[in-house]
Amino acid sequence: MIEVILDTETTGLSAEKDRIVEIACVELSNHIPTKNIFHTFLNPEIKVSADAFSVHGYSDEFLSNKPKFKDVAKDFLNFIKDKKLIIHNADFDLGFLNNELKRLNIKPILKSDILDTLQIARSKFPGVGNSLDALCKRFKISIEAREKHSALLDCHLLSKVYIELIDKKELTLDLMSNDKIFNEKMKLSNENREGVVVKVSPEQMEEYKKFLKKNVSNAFALD
């Protein structure tokens, strides 16, 4: 079974007025991350709100030379085609994605194509916090690296949370052995972010670390 973990970062909270600044997709095969990753930063063509910047740390200057959504839409849609999407708080991401697609006169992503891990968590743990951070703490998944939000890092965390939510704990060892591979693929160079399936070298990882240290206050550890 092939699925895709998906997450976005945005300029703000309004799907109507704000835009996407980062999309990350991680392919799963039988619930375990594969080597196929789609990741891109985007020029939103509007300013990032102060609140959003405090969450993810992506400045207007950093995003100014990134591709626009229209430039990566085809590759993005090809990556997720015919795959179940695993999203935490899917209404948020879906609202932004479908508004971007609407601007290009492309049909929307259907809710029937999505599994919302927030809804699963609420049904299993009613009346308590079920944010990604809360679930990671509940399942003893380290969030030490998550001082700032990153769509790609959050996909990695959600892949672990997902295993716990669907009671597939026997896959935990597979996830642990997969961490090294995933970590090598999640650090992208500042030059290689054009919305393609990414295959990342160790040298590119180091470049991404340098970018974070330079551009993001209290940049999260990537090792």
Give the predicted meaning of each segment:
Residues 1-112, 122, 132-149, 222:
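Conserved non-catalytic scaffold segment of RNase H-like nuclease domains
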Residues 164-223:
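Acidic two-metal-ion nuclease catalytic site recognized across multiple nuclease folds
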